[in-house]
Amino acid sequence: MYKITLIPGDGIGLEVTAAMKKVVEATGVAIEWEEVIAGEAVLEEYGSPLPDYVLDSIKKNKIAIKGPITTPVGKGFRSVNVALRKELKLFANVRPVKTFKGIKSRYEDIDLTIIRENTEDLYAGIEHQIGDYAGESIKLITRDASDRIVDFACKYLKDNGYKRLTGVHKANIMKISDGLFLRVFDEVSSRNGIERLEKGEAPDKVYADDVIVDAAAMNLVLNPEKFDVLVMPNLYGDILSDLCAGLVGGLGIIPSANIGEDYAVFEAVHGSAPQIAGQGI
């Protein structure tokens, strides 16, 4: 018997987590669900959308699955997703993107994974208001976090039988921050035995390459079947993983895993969609 923390979430969260439980039950795996509430439903009572008892439950059970939780735009409380990743040190966001039989999409043979560094970059939340005339956000990229996420991506690639590891960056413009990420990408992929191809060498083995983020966006639309595992800083991963979801039918069919050394939280990628909650859609 496995014990897993279940966070239903806001909006359609109650419906999608109920459906998820039925699917899991159909597999025959014995799971005891420990349900805890987070999000808008507890904000007034606890003064936070993420009460301590939620974190305590996840730390006890080591694994959680959650429905979507509403995040206010431009005001209000900070994202619960971001807080969970920070508090539990869930450094890797993993989003497999595959075409599914029976689901209409523009492509038939996509099988790739976006691996996103989860703890820093512009999503570290280091922001400052400068009077009424400016706002400042700090882009934080560290060697340790970059090393950790690229190492994770290398192991993921090998464990899942993929060949191509692609580092995504904007080092042509952000030469210090993204430049550091790219240097670490080369060091760590080489350390894991994943080398760049020599000129003219056929890609018949595992290999590494890199692509600037805007070129990655274009090529993911033009030739998504050519990619396997892409690893990148936080912001790029957030944007490109949603783009990839659009290639195979939308956010509603894409899973997401947030993984750390000690804990893992699995979730739906889509939002809470309060406008359709309770309609059985």
Model segments located where?
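Short coil/turn connectors at secondary-structure junctions
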Residues: 1-3, 29, 60-61, 89-90, ...
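Glycine-rich phosphate/diphosphate-binding loop of Rossmann-like nucleotide-binding domains
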Residues: 5-26, 131-214, 226
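N-terminal beta-loop-helix "entrance" segment that forms/cooperates
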Residues: 30-53, 220
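Glycine-rich phosphate/nucleotide-binding loop
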Residues: 40-44, 219-281
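Short, small-residue-enriched loops and turns at beta-alpha junctions
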Residues: 42-44, 72-73, 172-176, 218-219
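N-terminal glycine-rich phosphate/adenylate-binding segment common to multiple enzyme folds
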Residues: 44-136, 235
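Short, acidic/small-residue loops that bind anionic groups at enzyme active sites
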Residues: 85-99, 207-209, 253-269
